[in-house]
Amino acid sequence: MKQPVGIGVVGAGAIGIRGALMHLSLPDVQDRVRLAAVCDPAPGRAEAAAQKYGVAAHYTTYEGLLADPGVDAVTICSPIGLHYAQGLAAIQAGKHIHFNKTMTITAAEADDLIRRAAEKGICMVASPGMMLHPHNRRIRKLVLEGTLGRLAWAVTGTAGVGDYHMEEEFRTGQDVLTDVNPSWYFQKPGGGPQYDVTVYCLHNLTGILGPARRVTALSGMVIPERDYHGQKIICDMDDTTLMLLDFGDSFFAYVYGAVAGRVTQGFQPNIYGTLGAVVGTRFGEQELKLPDDHQPHVTGPHAGMLESHVFEDMMQLADWIREGKPSVANAEHARHVIDIVEAGYRAAATGQTQTLRTSFEPLPIEAL
Protein backbone atom coordinates (compact mmCIF):
# COMPACT_ATOMS: atom_id res chain seq x y z
CA MET A 1 0.00 0.00 0.00
CA LYS A 2 1.64 3.24 -1.14
CA GLN A 3 -1.23 5.71 -0.99
CA PRO A 4 -1.77 7.69 2.23
CA VAL A 5 -3.17 5.63 5.08
CA GLY A 6 -6.67 6.68 6.12
CA ILE A 7 -6.60 7.13 9.89
CA GLY A 8 -9.68 6.93 12.09
CA VAL A 9 -9.21 8.73 15.41
CA VAL A 10 -11.11 6.93 18.16
CA GLY A 11 -11.88 9.52 20.83
CA ALA A 12 -11.61 13.32 20.57
CA GLY A 13 -10.44 13.96 24.10
CA ALA A 14 -7.04 15.17 25.27
CA ILE A 15 -4.89 12.52 23.60
CA GLY A 16 -7.06 12.32 20.49
CA ILE A 17 -6.65 16.04 19.90
CA ARG A 18 -3.12 16.66 21.15
CA GLY A 19 -1.59 13.37 20.04
CA ALA A 20 -3.45 12.63 16.80
CA LEU A 21 -5.51 15.44 15.29
CA MET A 22 -3.04 18.29 15.83
CA HIS A 23 -0.18 16.32 14.28
CA LEU A 24 -1.97 14.43 11.51
CA SER A 25 -3.66 17.56 10.17
CA LEU A 26 -0.33 19.24 9.33
CA PRO A 27 0.65 19.52 5.64
CA ASP A 28 3.97 17.67 5.92
CA VAL A 29 2.37 14.24 6.52
CA GLN A 30 -0.43 14.28 3.96
CA ASP A 31 1.60 12.22 1.50
CA ARG A 32 1.61 9.36 4.04
CA VAL A 33 -1.49 9.71 6.20
CA ARG A 34 -4.87 11.41 5.97
CA LEU A 35 -7.51 12.04 8.61
CA ALA A 36 -10.34 9.87 7.36
CA ALA A 37 -12.65 9.98 10.37
CA VAL A 38 -13.05 10.78 14.05
CA CYS A 39 -15.56 9.39 16.53
CA ASP A 40 -16.59 10.32 20.06
CA PRO A 41 -19.80 9.55 21.99
CA ALA A 42 -20.01 13.02 23.59
CA PRO A 43 -22.67 15.01 21.69
CA GLY A 44 -21.08 17.40 19.21
CA ARG A 45 -17.47 16.59 20.09
CA ALA A 46 -16.54 14.55 17.00
CA GLU A 47 -18.23 17.06 14.71
CA ALA A 48 -16.41 19.97 16.36
CA ALA A 49 -13.09 18.14 16.11
CA ALA A 50 -13.69 17.28 12.45
CA GLN A 51 -14.45 20.89 11.60
CA LYS A 52 -11.45 22.24 13.48
CA TYR A 53 -8.89 19.77 12.11
CA GLY A 54 -10.25 19.06 8.64
CA VAL A 55 -11.30 15.45 9.19
CA ALA A 56 -13.25 13.90 6.33
CA ALA A 57 -15.99 12.29 8.44
CA HIS A 58 -17.26 12.25 12.01
CA TYR A 59 -19.29 9.75 14.00
CA THR A 60 -20.83 9.43 17.45
CA THR A 61 -20.28 5.66 17.41
CA TYR A 62 -17.17 3.55 17.00
CA GLU A 63 -19.17 1.16 14.84
CA GLY A 64 -19.87 3.97 12.39
CA LEU A 65 -16.18 4.79 12.11
CA LEU A 66 -15.22 1.13 11.55
CA ALA A 67 -17.79 0.85 8.77
CA ASP A 68 -16.27 3.81 6.91
CA PRO A 69 -14.42 2.43 3.84
CA GLY A 70 -12.02 5.37 3.97
CA VAL A 71 -10.59 4.18 7.28
CA ASP A 72 -7.58 1.88 6.84
CA ALA A 73 -6.31 2.07 10.41
CA VAL A 74 -7.41 3.37 13.78
CA THR A 75 -5.58 5.17 16.53
CA ILE A 76 -7.31 4.24 19.78
CA CYS A 77 -7.36 7.35 21.97
CA SER A 78 -10.16 6.28 24.31
CA PRO A 79 -10.01 5.43 28.04
CA ILE A 80 -7.73 2.45 28.67
CA GLY A 81 -10.54 0.22 29.91
CA LEU A 82 -12.07 0.28 26.40
CA HIS A 83 -8.91 -0.61 24.47
CA TYR A 84 -9.28 -4.38 24.36
CA ALA A 85 -12.86 -4.41 23.08
CA GLN A 86 -12.13 -1.65 20.58
CA GLY A 87 -8.99 -3.41 19.39
CA LEU A 88 -10.92 -6.63 18.93
CA ALA A 89 -13.59 -4.85 16.90
CA ALA A 90 -10.94 -3.19 14.72
CA ILE A 91 -9.31 -6.54 13.96
CA GLN A 92 -12.69 -8.03 13.06
CA ALA A 93 -13.28 -5.06 10.74
CA GLY A 94 -9.88 -5.53 9.08
CA LYS A 95 -8.41 -2.25 10.34
CA HIS A 96 -4.77 -1.85 11.38
CA ILE A 97 -4.30 -0.47 14.89
CA HIS A 98 -2.26 2.01 16.88
CA PHE A 99 -2.94 1.67 20.60
CA ASN A 100 -2.25 4.51 22.95
CA LYS A 101 -0.90 3.15 26.21
CA THR A 102 -1.74 0.75 27.54
CA MET A 103 -2.83 -1.65 24.85
CA THR A 104 -4.98 -3.63 27.29
CA ILE A 105 -5.47 -4.08 31.02
CA THR A 106 -4.46 -7.75 31.22
CA ALA A 107 -1.81 -9.89 29.57
CA ALA A 108 -4.51 -12.38 28.55
CA GLU A 109 -6.30 -9.64 26.60
CA ALA A 110 -3.02 -8.74 24.92
CA ASP A 111 -2.44 -12.41 24.05
CA ASP A 112 -5.82 -12.55 22.35
CA LEU A 113 -5.27 -9.40 20.30
CA ILE A 114 -1.80 -10.49 19.19
CA ARG A 115 -3.09 -13.89 18.10
CA ARG A 116 -6.11 -12.53 16.25
CA ALA A 117 -4.10 -9.78 14.53
CA ALA A 118 -1.54 -12.31 13.30
CA GLU A 119 -4.28 -14.54 11.93
CA LYS A 120 -5.77 -11.66 9.91
CA GLY A 121 -2.55 -9.92 8.88
CA ILE A 122 -3.32 -6.82 10.94
CA CYS A 123 -0.45 -4.51 11.88
CA MET A 124 -0.47 -3.38 15.51
CA VAL A 125 1.74 -0.69 17.03
CA ALA A 126 1.46 -0.16 20.78
CA SER A 127 2.61 3.02 22.49
CA PRO A 128 4.84 4.14 23.99
CA GLY A 129 7.71 3.36 21.61
CA MET A 130 10.37 4.53 24.03
CA MET A 131 13.19 2.63 22.30
CA LEU A 132 12.74 4.91 19.29
CA HIS A 133 14.52 7.59 21.32
CA PRO A 134 18.25 7.68 20.44
CA HIS A 135 19.33 8.23 24.04
CA ASN A 136 17.64 5.02 25.17
CA ARG A 137 19.49 3.11 22.48
CA ARG A 138 22.79 4.58 23.67
CA ILE A 139 22.01 3.55 27.24
CA ARG A 140 21.14 0.01 26.17
CA LYS A 141 24.41 -0.18 24.25
CA LEU A 142 26.36 0.82 27.37
CA VAL A 143 24.59 -1.94 29.29
CA LEU A 144 25.20 -4.60 26.63
CA GLU A 145 28.85 -3.65 26.21
CA GLY A 146 29.41 -4.03 29.95
CA THR A 147 30.45 -0.41 30.42
CA LEU A 148 28.50 -0.20 33.69
CA GLY A 149 30.09 -3.41 34.97
CA ARG A 150 27.84 -5.90 36.68
CA LEU A 151 24.41 -4.37 37.12
CA ALA A 152 23.54 -3.75 40.78
CA TRP A 153 20.11 -2.10 40.90
CA ALA A 154 17.86 0.45 39.19
CA VAL A 155 15.07 2.86 40.03
CA THR A 156 12.40 4.60 37.94
CA GLY A 157 8.97 6.05 38.43
CA THR A 158 6.68 9.03 38.35
CA ALA A 159 4.42 11.05 40.62
CA GLY A 160 1.65 13.64 40.57
CA VAL A 161 -0.05 12.64 37.32
CA GLY A 162 -3.53 12.88 38.83
CA ASP A 163 -3.12 16.59 39.48
CA TYR A 164 -1.69 17.02 35.97
CA HIS A 165 -4.78 15.51 34.35
CA MET A 166 -7.10 17.72 36.39
CA GLU A 167 -5.33 20.83 35.11
CA GLU A 168 -4.83 19.99 31.41
CA GLU A 169 -6.03 22.59 28.92
CA PHE A 170 -8.71 20.14 27.77
CA ARG A 171 -10.32 20.21 31.25
CA THR A 172 -10.43 23.93 31.93
CA GLY A 173 -12.58 25.34 29.12
CA GLN A 174 -16.31 25.66 28.52
CA ASP A 175 -16.79 24.15 25.05
CA VAL A 176 -17.11 20.55 23.94
CA LEU A 177 -13.40 20.24 23.07
CA THR A 178 -12.02 21.79 26.26
CA ASP A 179 -14.37 20.41 28.92
CA VAL A 180 -13.39 16.74 28.78
CA ASN A 181 -14.22 14.93 32.03
CA PRO A 182 -11.13 13.19 33.51
CA SER A 183 -13.04 10.82 35.84
CA TRP A 184 -11.84 7.63 34.16
CA TYR A 185 -8.23 8.33 35.16
CA PHE A 186 -9.21 7.66 38.77
CA GLN A 187 -11.53 4.69 38.32
CA LYS A 188 -11.51 1.04 37.36
CA PRO A 189 -10.91 -0.40 34.87
CA GLY A 190 -7.74 1.14 33.52
CA GLY A 191 -7.33 4.17 35.77
CA GLY A 192 -4.47 4.96 38.10
CA PRO A 193 -0.86 5.96 37.43
CA GLN A 194 0.39 2.45 36.62
CA TYR A 195 -1.49 2.07 33.35
CA ASP A 196 -1.33 5.78 32.57
CA VAL A 197 2.24 6.93 33.19
CA THR A 198 4.33 4.31 35.00
CA VAL A 199 3.97 2.44 31.72
CA TYR A 200 6.46 4.92 30.19
CA CYS A 201 8.97 4.15 32.92
CA LEU A 202 8.49 0.41 32.46
CA HIS A 203 8.92 0.61 28.68
CA ASN A 204 12.15 2.54 29.20
CA LEU A 205 13.39 0.16 31.89
CA THR A 206 12.63 -3.08 30.07
CA GLY A 207 13.55 -1.68 26.66
CA ILE A 208 17.01 -0.88 28.01
CA LEU A 209 17.49 -3.90 30.28
CA GLY A 210 15.31 -6.58 28.71
CA PRO A 211 12.36 -8.47 30.20
CA ALA A 212 11.83 -8.83 33.94
CA ARG A 213 11.17 -12.16 35.64
CA ARG A 214 9.31 -11.52 38.89
CA VAL A 215 7.53 -8.69 40.69
CA THR A 216 6.33 -7.89 44.18
CA ALA A 217 4.50 -4.76 45.26
CA LEU A 218 2.56 -2.67 47.74
CA SER A 219 -0.38 -0.60 46.53
CA GLY A 220 -3.08 1.67 47.91
CA MET A 221 -5.12 4.84 47.56
CA VAL A 222 -4.06 8.18 49.07
CA ILE A 223 -6.72 10.50 47.58
CA PRO A 224 -10.21 8.90 47.68
CA GLU A 225 -12.09 11.69 45.92
CA ARG A 226 -11.46 14.68 43.65
CA ASP A 227 -13.45 17.65 42.41
CA TYR A 228 -14.00 18.50 38.74
CA HIS A 229 -15.93 21.71 38.07
CA GLY A 230 -17.93 21.19 41.26
CA GLN A 231 -18.63 17.54 40.46
CA LYS A 232 -17.29 14.97 42.89
CA ILE A 233 -15.15 12.17 41.43
CA ILE A 234 -15.17 9.06 43.61
CA CYS A 235 -11.81 7.33 43.11
CA ASP A 236 -11.76 3.53 43.24
CA MET A 237 -8.37 2.83 41.64
CA ASP A 238 -5.09 2.78 43.56
CA ASP A 239 -3.09 5.97 43.10
CA THR A 240 0.14 4.85 44.76
CA THR A 241 1.91 1.61 43.82
CA LEU A 242 5.49 0.65 44.68
CA MET A 243 6.97 -2.35 42.85
CA LEU A 244 10.19 -4.33 43.10
CA LEU A 245 11.22 -6.14 39.91
CA ASP A 246 13.61 -9.07 39.65
CA PHE A 247 15.58 -9.25 36.39
CA GLY A 248 17.59 -12.28 37.47
CA ASP A 249 21.26 -12.56 38.46
CA SER A 250 20.54 -10.61 41.68
CA PHE A 251 19.66 -7.47 39.71
CA PHE A 252 16.58 -5.66 41.03
CA ALA A 253 14.69 -2.49 40.13
CA TYR A 254 12.41 -0.29 42.22
CA VAL A 255 9.48 1.21 40.28
CA TYR A 256 7.09 3.76 41.79
CA GLY A 257 3.89 5.44 40.72
CA ALA A 258 2.60 7.81 43.39
CA VAL A 259 0.54 10.92 44.06
CA ALA A 260 3.66 12.87 45.06
CA GLY A 261 7.39 12.51 45.61
CA ARG A 262 9.52 12.06 42.50
CA VAL A 263 13.06 10.73 43.05
CA THR A 264 14.10 10.22 39.41
CA GLN A 265 14.26 12.38 36.27
CA GLY A 266 11.27 12.28 33.94
CA PHE A 267 10.46 8.73 32.89
CA GLN A 268 14.13 7.74 32.72
CA PRO A 269 15.61 5.09 35.01
CA ASN A 270 18.74 5.39 37.09
CA ILE A 271 20.81 2.27 36.46
CA TYR A 272 23.68 1.50 38.82
CA GLY A 273 26.52 -0.91 38.09
CA THR A 274 29.80 -1.87 39.70
CA LEU A 275 31.78 0.27 37.23
CA GLY A 276 29.46 3.21 36.68
CA ALA A 277 25.91 4.49 36.54
CA VAL A 278 23.45 6.09 34.17
CA VAL A 279 21.42 8.68 36.06
CA GLY A 280 18.55 9.87 33.91
CA THR A 281 20.27 10.55 30.60
CA ARG A 282 23.79 11.10 31.98
CA PHE A 283 26.65 8.63 32.17
CA GLY A 284 29.04 10.34 34.55
CA GLU A 285 29.78 13.70 32.92
CA GLN A 286 28.56 12.53 29.51
CA GLU A 287 25.09 13.63 28.41
CA LEU A 288 23.51 10.84 26.37
CA LYS A 289 20.59 12.92 25.10
CA LEU A 290 22.08 15.06 22.35
CA PRO A 291 20.69 18.40 21.09
CA ASP A 292 19.84 17.07 17.62
CA ASP A 293 18.25 13.83 18.84
CA HIS A 294 14.74 13.06 17.66
CA GLN A 295 12.53 10.11 16.92
CA PRO A 296 12.51 9.23 13.20
CA HIS A 297 9.39 11.22 12.21
CA VAL A 298 9.51 13.95 14.85
CA THR A 299 10.93 16.72 12.69
CA GLY A 300 9.84 20.20 11.62
CA PRO A 301 6.78 21.49 13.47
CA HIS A 302 6.19 18.17 15.23
CA ALA A 303 9.38 18.56 17.25
CA GLY A 304 7.93 21.52 19.11
CA MET A 305 4.50 20.01 19.73
CA LEU A 306 3.16 18.05 22.66
CA GLU A 307 2.64 14.27 22.42
CA SER A 308 5.15 13.98 19.59
CA HIS A 309 5.88 10.43 20.75
CA VAL A 310 2.27 9.49 20.00
CA PHE A 311 2.62 10.99 16.54
CA GLU A 312 5.81 8.98 16.05
CA ASP A 313 4.09 5.73 16.96
CA MET A 314 1.24 6.45 14.54
CA MET A 315 3.77 7.09 11.79
CA GLN A 316 5.48 3.83 12.69
CA LEU A 317 2.17 2.13 11.93
CA ALA A 318 1.84 4.02 8.65
CA ASP A 319 5.32 2.89 7.61
CA TRP A 320 4.47 -0.70 8.48
CA ILE A 321 1.28 -0.59 6.40
CA ARG A 322 2.84 1.23 3.45
CA GLU A 323 6.32 -0.29 3.39
CA GLY A 324 6.11 -3.52 5.37
CA LYS A 325 8.44 -2.21 8.11
CA PRO A 326 7.52 -3.64 11.54
CA SER A 327 8.13 -1.34 14.49
CA VAL A 328 10.10 -1.66 17.70
CA ALA A 329 6.96 -0.20 19.32
CA ASN A 330 5.45 -3.64 19.17
CA ALA A 331 2.60 -5.42 20.91
CA GLU A 332 4.86 -8.03 22.48
CA HIS A 333 6.82 -5.42 24.45
CA ALA A 334 3.57 -3.72 25.46
CA ARG A 335 2.18 -7.07 26.64
CA HIS A 336 5.20 -7.63 28.88
CA VAL A 337 4.76 -4.22 30.51
CA ILE A 338 1.06 -4.95 31.02
CA ASP A 339 2.05 -8.27 32.60
CA ILE A 340 4.27 -6.38 35.06
CA VAL A 341 1.52 -3.93 36.01
CA GLU A 342 -1.12 -6.63 36.35
CA ALA A 343 1.19 -8.90 38.35
CA GLY A 344 2.16 -5.96 40.56
CA TYR A 345 -1.45 -5.42 41.57
CA ARG A 346 -1.83 -9.16 42.14
CA ALA A 347 1.29 -9.23 44.30
CA ALA A 348 0.01 -6.32 46.37
CA ALA A 349 -3.37 -8.00 46.86
CA THR A 350 -1.96 -11.40 47.83
CA GLY A 351 1.29 -10.47 49.54
CA GLN A 352 3.07 -12.95 47.28
CA THR A 353 5.79 -12.36 44.71
CA GLN A 354 4.49 -13.06 41.20
CA THR A 355 6.37 -14.78 38.38
CA LEU A 356 5.89 -13.01 35.05
CA ARG A 357 4.70 -15.24 32.24
CA THR A 358 5.54 -13.05 29.24
CA SER A 359 8.70 -11.91 27.51
CA PHE A 360 9.76 -10.03 24.39
CA GLU A 361 12.85 -9.61 22.21
CA PRO A 362 14.73 -6.41 23.17
CA LEU A 363 16.90 -4.65 20.61
CA PRO A 364 20.13 -6.54 19.88
CA ILE A 365 23.42 -4.65 19.98
CA GLU A 366 23.72 -4.63 16.18
CA ALA A 367 20.47 -2.62 15.99
CA LEU A 368 21.84 0.12 18.25
Each model region followed by its residue ranges:
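Contiguous beta-strand/loop segments that form the cofactor/metal-binding neighborhood of enzyme cores
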Residues: G173-Q174, D196-V197, C201-E285, F311-S327, ...
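C-terminal helix-rich "cap/oligomerization" subdomain common to oxidoreductases
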Residues: M1-P4, V9, A73-T75, D319-L368
